[in-house]
């Protein structure tokens, strides 16, 4: 099975460069997913969205829909269309985001806002029906993970994907949640 992991966290090295925070909770969850998926024989690719140029939706055109409603692409010349098209090549998706202020990260919101606009009403969607695993990583108390996972439920509804697992992770429960992540990577089941 081909699985795409999209993560939405990084540390800024300088004003032009981002690198994944290799000691952070989100990166640790990505590593755990990659390890388990590969152990199960899956072909895995990871894209850190923060390292890409993804601009916010412009709500352009008539009634704010631009060409995304009819053509299922975005007029902006950034990395979004390439990633969106690339998503067609995969059988399942793992979305891993940090939780900031009881919400998914800003880069996740930006990416998913545009993804919904291009794909939610696409009857020929190549994403619809595919399994997703959503992981919300909170460095604080973890109280924002549920709100973040509810936002993923809404995304799942509009994209027509199949929610395979929704996993709240905190600094204090990460070791326990490793087993949950491991089990969630068994995408061939159910």
Positions of predicted regions on the chain:
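Short, glycine-/small-residue-rich phosphate/pyrophosphate-handling segment
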Residues: 106-107, 121-166
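N-terminal beta1-alpha1-beta2 submodule of the flavodoxin-like/Rossmannoid cofactor-binding fold
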Residues: 1-97, 101-117, 168, 174-190
């Amino acid at each position: 099975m081909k699985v795409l992991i999209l993560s939405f966290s990084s540390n800024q090295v300088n004003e032009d460069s981002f690198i994944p925070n290799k000691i952070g909770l989100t990166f640790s969850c990505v590593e755990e997913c990659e390890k388990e998926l590969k152990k199960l024989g899956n072909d895995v690719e990871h894209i850190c969205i923060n390292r890409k140029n993804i601009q916010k939706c412009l709500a352009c055109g008539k009634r704010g829909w631009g060409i995304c409603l009819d053509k299922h692409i975005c007029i902006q010349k950034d990395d979004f269309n390439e990633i969106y098209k690339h998503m067609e090549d995969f059988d399942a998706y793992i979305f891993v985001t940090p939780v900031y202020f009881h919400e998914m990260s800003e880069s996740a919101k930006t990416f998913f806002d545009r993804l919904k606009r291009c794909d939610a009403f696409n009857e020929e969607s190549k994403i619809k029906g595919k399994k997703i695993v959503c992981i919300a990583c909170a460095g604080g108390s973890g109280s924002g993970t549920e709100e973040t996972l509810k936002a993923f439920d809404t995304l799942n509804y509009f994209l027509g994907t199949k929610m395979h697992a929704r996993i709240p992770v905190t600094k204090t429960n990460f070791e326990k949640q490793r087993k949950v992540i491991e089990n969630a990577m068994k995408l061939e089941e159910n």
